[in-house]
Amino acid sequence: MTRYAGLGRTRPKKLTPKAPIPIYREHQIDDLEEEIQNGLQQVETGVEKAEESEYHLQVAINAVASGRVVNEAHIPTPETVLSNLQYDELYPPVFSQPATYIRFSSTVEDCCGCPYNMTDEDDVFLKIMNEKRDPADRCTEDQFEEVMNFFEETVRLKQPYAAVGSAPVLSFAEMQESMDATVEDYVRRLAKDVYDHWKTRRLNNGNQSLLPSLKFETGAETDDTDPYVCFRRREVRQVRKTRGRDAQSADKLRRLRKELEDARQLVALVRQRELARKEMLATERILFLQRAEVKDMKRKLNIKDDDEDLINQKPKKKPIEAPPMQRPAAAQLRMPPKPGAQAAEDLQLLEDVQAEKENEIIRDIKANIAKHMKWNEGYVDFTRAPLSPSPERTVDISFRPAITTQLPTPPSSDSSENTPDLALDMSGTVSYRDKLDEHALIMSEDANKMPSFRRRIGRGGRLLIDRRNFASRCRVELDPWKADRFKYDQEDSDEDLDYEMDQYDISLMQNRAIMLAKARDQAHAQAQAAQVRRLQAEQAALNNLNSGQTSGQTMGSNPGPGAIAPTPET
């Protein structure tokens, strides 16, 4: 259980292109199980993942896990001191406090000297080379380092990425081209002998620099486990792009483009202006030379004439003659108008401009309506509020007076004995009266006061006839209650008229709010009045009860003079 506990608490790392993935064959299954067991033991080692595969660390961990006794294992480390020289004896600590910390004004580069340091190979080559040369012309170690440094600096300037690609090593001719006045004479003299040695070392080093430098990442897989790689790249989190960020970037680019276009246009205009000035100067120069030739020719031919044509004459302005009997206008400080300028137009009023715009809009609307009606010829537009409504059959809904020429029988509601004698006139209209006789309705011979009827079509194609009775006139002696009974003596139509209205109209909403407020106030007032009446009734009942008790006590006993009446209990 202990071995598998660490595996459950460890998250598997994501696969990366840099991590090698092993491939196992069928005959490697047993070894695979052993490696899995070893991996379970290596989960909690306390060191970094890249250092868990160290040999001595694995030996120590496996020994502890198996419980067997082995020799003490240790991780070897290199010695910090490479030689047995005692620097304290060679350099005695003799130090004197300086008067000032600044002892010289040389720069750090001047004090460092040559950055190239000789190696054992260089020392062997230098000794062999000096044996072949004269004692007076031998090369010292400092001179050798200067020559090697010159080669390295030249390659760094001409081939900065020589180590990345497969660039060839610079030839000696290219090295000689780089020798300028700053190069010492001994470098020129010893360069040819040292070049072959430098080229050999450069090729052995993979055409990389021989100077000690910091080691950076090269993109190889060994960079992750190489402890000497400095300034490692880290995984930079990708910036999350949003539409707002894209819009801001687009606005910035658009603004920058506009500024650049404006600057470019200004530069183009300035260039055009300068070219025009240059052309004008050239024209003036040609004109001046031609005038000089004309002047010389006049002198040779002895032509006596004015030289006005040789001078640029400005046209004189014609004076404006003021009309007679007119007061001269006051002097105005205005710029003189240009010769090609147009005359100023009359100032237009804002009302005129707005009226013109409105008239133009109305004309456009009428033109569009006429065009739409022309398009819809022969068609019926059933859309809502059409521009060209379909012609509907007009129905005369007005009432028409009923003119009777004959009444063969009296009304069925009248009895025979009470019916007055009616003279039937076949040639004219018949006038008749009801039971009220002269006290009720008086019919007029005017056609406008005659009974009228109206015909209309209801639902389902039913034919309906509405009637309008005589106009009644109430006399003084007629009871108003009796006259009012005929006010609504008419039949209701079968078809109820629906009045469409917007229930969300402001006026209707205000009306409903006012009516609801009034109803609420009335209900509140009624409740208060009912409560007051209830309190008054309770108070009256209590007063009646108290008065009855007082009268009973008075009738039961007859107190003498000076007696005190009992106080009523409340």
Swiss-Prot record:
Region Disordered: start-end pairs: 541-570
Predominant location: nucleus
Ranges annotated as biased composition (Polar residues): 543-557
UniProt family annotation: Belongs to the enhancer of polycomb family.
Keywords assigned: Cell cycle, DNA damage, DNA repair, Nucleus, Transcription, Transcription regulation
Cellular component GO terms, alphabetical: NuA4 histone acetyltransferase complex; nucleus; piccolo histone acetyltransferase complex
Function recorded in the entry: Component of the NuA4 histone acetyltransferase complex which is involved in transcriptional activation of selected genes principally by acetylation of nucleosomal histone H4 and H2A. The NuA4 complex is also involved in DNA repair. Involved in gene silencing by neighboring heterochromatin, blockage of the silencing spreading along the chromosome, and required for cell cycle progression through G2/M.
Example of a GO biological process term: DNA repair
Quaternary organization: Component of the NuA4 histone acetyltransferase complex.
Protein name in the entry: Enhancer of polycomb-like protein 1
Superkingdom of origin: Eukaryota
Intracellular or extracellular location(s): Nucleus
